């Protein structure tokens, strides 16, 4: 596949400022509003991220851990899930950059990471 840079899809519960800060640093960051998916279910958000080949960023640990298990159990692939604890947007971006600057999109495939 050879995808180098991780592109992110931000779940509805992630502050849109995170996307703005990432874009200012040259990263691709799609919000649920950008994708026209406001108020979509978690499964729909995940399917959208998969379709866009983007890693999903969320604060919703329980539901997205369950979705990751479902994808694994059913042999479905995804482009990664990053679960962030709630912090100010600048802190979330600081933590994200540790992954974005060290992990390729291919390495993120089917991974579940926590920041």
What are these regions (language model features)?
Residues 1-12, 16-19, 23-24, 37, ...:
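Acidic, PIN/NYN-like endoribonuclease modules and their adjacent C-terminal/linker elements
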Residues 28-40:
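Conserved BB-loop
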Residues 42, 48-67:
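Acidic, metal-binding active-site segment of PIN/NYN-like and related structure-specific nucleases
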Residues 31, 56, 83:
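Short catalytic-loop micro-motif centered on adjacent basic/acidic residues
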């Amino acid at each position: 596949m050879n995808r180098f840079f991780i592109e992110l899809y931000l779940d509805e519960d992630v502050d849109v400022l995170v996307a703005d800060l990432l874009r200012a640093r040259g990263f691709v960051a799609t919000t649920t509003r950008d994708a026209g998916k406001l108020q979509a279910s978690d499964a729909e958000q995940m399917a959208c991220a998969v379709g866009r080949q983007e890693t999903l960023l969320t604060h919703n640990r329980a539901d997205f851990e369950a979705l990751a298990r479902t994808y694994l159990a059913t042999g479905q692939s995804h482009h990664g899930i990053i679960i962030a604890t709630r912090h100010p947007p600048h802190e979330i971006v600081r933590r994200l950059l540790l992954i974005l600057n060290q992990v390729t999109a291919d390495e993120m495939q089917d991974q579940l990471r926590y920041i």
